[in-house]
């Protein structure tokens, strides 16, 4: 009986590990209207990428990833001429696996307002992000401190500040 219980626990742990690994390889985007879209690592890897050259803790690095504006537009978030008036109160909450969260105003992300591209990186110096950083990381060139460079990103949520 104890041996069966042991095997059951082993199998359950394997399935749990597999489920956590799969969840870690996806990104959930939720719009201000509550519409949710989940992207896989493969879908993100297949999206148009840009490269940004930055210093990460005083070390030169090149990150490759998808501009947040591209990801949000693909999920149905209206940017550009549609981002005006009351919609300028909308923000993007970035969620990490360790429950760390940061906020960006949508205007910071929108190329119609901002001169920099904030990206969801999946590569650093030509290699996939390691488990400590990835699979996804926010890179915000121009921030004086990297406090909003979220590692292990799991979700992007748009909401209006009231």
Role assignments for model-derived ranges:
Residues 22-162:
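N-terminal intrinsically disordered, low-complexity segments enriched in P/E/S/T
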Residues 1-6:
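N-terminal secretory signal peptides that target proteins for export/translocation
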């Amino acid at each position: 009986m104890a041996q069966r219980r042991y095997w059951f626990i082993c199998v359950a742990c394997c399935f749990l590990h597999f489920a956590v690994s799969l969840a870690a390889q996806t990104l959930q985007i939720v719009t201000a209207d509550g519409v949710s879209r989940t992207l896989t690592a493969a879908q993100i890897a297949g999206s148009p990428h840009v490269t940004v050259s930055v210093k990460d803790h005083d070390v030169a690095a090149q990150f490759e990833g998808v501009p947040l504006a591209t990801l949000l537009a693909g999920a149905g978030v209206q940017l550009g001429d549609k981002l005006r008036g009351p919609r300028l109160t909308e923000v993007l909450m970035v969620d990490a696996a360790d429950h760390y969260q940061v906020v960006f105003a949508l205007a910071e992300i929108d190329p119609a307002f901002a001169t920099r591209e904030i990206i969801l990186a999946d590569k650093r110096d030509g290699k996939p992000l390691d488990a400590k950083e990835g699979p996804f990381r926010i890179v915000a060139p121009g921030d004086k401190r990297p406090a909003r460079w979220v590692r292990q990103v799991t979700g992007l949520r748009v909401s209006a500040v009231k």
